[in-house]
A protein has these predicted regions:
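Glycan-processing catalytic domains of CAZymes
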Residues: 2-269, 418-455
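Short carbohydrate-recognition loop motifs
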Residues: 269-295, 422-429
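Short beta-strands within extracellular/lumenal beta-sheet-rich domains
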Residues: 284-308, 353-357
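Extended, low-complexity, turn-rich repeat/linker tracts enriched in Gly/Pro/Ser/Thr and Asp/Glu
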Residues: 291, 305-307, 317-328, 379-383
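Extracellular carbohydrate recognition
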Residues: 293-295, 326, 378-400, 429-432
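Extracellular beta-strand-rich recognition modules
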Residues: 310-318, 368-378, 392, 406
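Extracellular carbohydrate recognition and processing domains
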Residues: 335-368, 379-382, 410-412, 424
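Soluble extracellular-acting proteins and domains
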Residues: 450-520
Length: 520
């Protein structure tokens, strides 16, 4: 049978924001410039098709974009979006050379895009936090300055889910070409929970779809300010799988990682446990605050032994901003329903681990079983602020605890009576950066393979590619390996595709198999 040529389908919008690599040494101007060759190599390795180029970290970023990065990205087949910071982020450092003159920025970027067709548009960070500056009238001037030079120049504001509503869109609809929505759990600002990601993406999609606006979902691959730690590899994995499902269903038109690190070394500032790598954390993010009486807790059932003498030594710490008042939050330890220890969150220095020893004999004598609970409780006040506390290295006498050192997530249950109190065993991962990189590479290349086969492969292969994607989205690693093996065998036996196409897809399958072997 004669092999038919198939046109290449348009690449899916799989992107990355910032996380740029810098040259190891400064140039003659004293600045470490963007390391374009290494950055392009990493983006290609990841399978990135769209890169949000942040102009902020160095005064030479604009010139590096114009003279080095854009031509290299064009040759590599990568589309570029200039990412600008708003006035709220420009108090100390501005985007050079035009600062907060965004009319000048749009004019300059529009002119540059006439020379580089892969320069697609502009993304404005934290747009909804700067509406007093970005009035519809001013945004119209920005847009006009760019469109006058290049009518195809696009503007996608970066907006959070909580600001996406019909009244807002009614004012700005004619000024947007699409929206970038960064997921951080809505009003409960964190990078620990993903349970509402797909619901928020679906609702935002329906709202924007009525206006004819595409939605790009951005998920955190690195630290969000005022949170306990970087998002775990597991969090990034869940976020990307949810994003791929939304992309597959057509609810979003693109998926982007927020600051995916491309150099891999331990993030030692995240190693905050008293001993080892893990500790029990209770976190209240900035946003809607718990009311007095609201709480989160870490609990374990215990069975006191027959010794008749019971003690507990434990370690605890607090992290909070300066505006937290004394008396608003307390840490507690309970036996059953009785509070046996309490201390104000502000007692002691920030991040300082303190040791406490309690005599629990009066509370445990004669009991066959009960519970040990550590709590974070709001006592009074209503001011919104973020904070978190930690417990670690519990040394019991007269009873046993499972994973008293919090080096494993099991053994402890986390509960709260308010969604703004988030509990989790946080375990420092010295290989987090590499693991997140490999997870992203696997996800992106899987979707590329699925997209290419579903667009131009014969029906039997399309079904197998869809099965492979569903296994990835479902987190079923063993099924993915099996699906890849079956797909490879089917390709080797196929006689309807050009040999070059078969070889390309087989090479992609082999690459995915290697990634899964390294980071299962």
């Amino acid at each position: 049978m004669t092999a038919l040529a198939h046109p290449s389908p348009p690449s899916p919008f799989l992107g990355d924001y910032a996380g740029e690599l810098r040259e190891p040494r400064p140039r003659k101007d004293g600045v470490r410039h963007v390391d374009t060759p290494r950055l392009i190599q990493k983006l290609k390795e990841l399978g990135v098709t769209h890169y949000f180029y942040l102009i902020w970290h160095a005064p030479t970023d604009w010139d590096d974009l114009r003279h080095e990065f854009l031509p290299a990205a064009r040759q590599a087949g990568i589309d570029v979006w200039v990412y600008l910071v708003p006035p709220s982020e420009s108090r100390r450092i501005q985007s050079e050379p035009f600062g907060t003159d965004y009319v000048a920025w749009f004019r300059a970027i529009g002119s540059l895009s006439r020379h580089y067709a892969n320069l697609k548009g502009i993304v404005m960070d934290d747009f909804n936090h700067n509406l007093s500056f970005f009035t519809p009238e001013y945004v119209a001037k920005m847009k006009q300055a760019g469109k006058k030079i290049n009518p195809d120049l696009l503007f996608y504001p970066q907006i959070y889910y909580t600001a996406l509503h019909s009244h807002f869109l009614k004012k700005y609809r004619s000024l947007f070409d699409g929206v970038v929505m960064t997921f951080r759990d809505g009003k409960y600002r964190n990078t620990q929970r993903t349970r509402d990601l797909e619901d928020q993406a679906s609702k935002a999609s329906r709202l924007l779809n009525r206006e004819g606006l595409p939605l790009i979902l951005m998920v955190h691959a690195s630290k969000l300010s005022a949170t306990p730690s970087h998002p775990s590899a597991r969090y990034v994995d869940r976020s990307l799988r949810a994003g791929l499902r939304q992309l597959h269903h057509g609810n979003i038109q693109g998926l982007v990682t927020y600051v995916l690190h491309k150099e891999w070394f331990p993030e030692r500032r995240d190693r905050t446990a008293y001993s080892g790598y893990g500790y029990g954390s209770l976190f209240i993010p900035s946003g809607p605050s718990p009311a007095p009486g609201d709480k989160g807790e870490i609990r374990q059932r215990i069975r006191p032994g027959p010794s008749g003498e019971y003690r507990l030594r434990f370690h605890h710490m607090s992290v909070y901003p300066r505006n937290l008042r004394k008396g608003e939050y307390v840490k507690q330890l309970l036996i059953g329903n009785r509070v046996v220890w309490e201390e104000d969150v502000r007692a002691g220095r920030v991040e300082e681990w303190k040791r406490k020893t309690l005599n629990l004999t009066p509370h445990l004598r004669g009991k066959k079983k009960t519970s040990l609970t550590m709590r974070l409780v709001r006592k009074q006040g209503k001011s919104p602020t973020w904070l978190y506390i930690g417990f670690d290295r519990l040394d019991p006498l007269g009873f046993q605890l499972t994973h008293a050192d919090f080096e494993e997530p099991s053994g402890w249950s986390y509960r709260s009576n308010h969604p703004a109190v988030i509990g989790e065993t946080l375990i420092y991962d010295p290989n987090r950066r590499l693991r997140v990189y490999l997870i992203t590479m696997m996800m992106y290349h899987t979707f590329h393979l699925y997209h290419q086969i579903s667009s131009s492969g014969p029906p039997p292969l399309q079904g197998m590619a869809d099965s492979m994607l569903q296994s990835v989205i479902g987190g079923r690693t063993q099924h993915v390996c099996r699906d890849l093996e079956l797909l490879k065998k089917a390709l080797e036996q196929d006689d309807t595709l050009p040999s070059s196409q078969r070889e390309t897809w087989i090479n992609q399958i082999d690459r995915l198999d290697r990634i899964l072997t390294i980071n299962p």
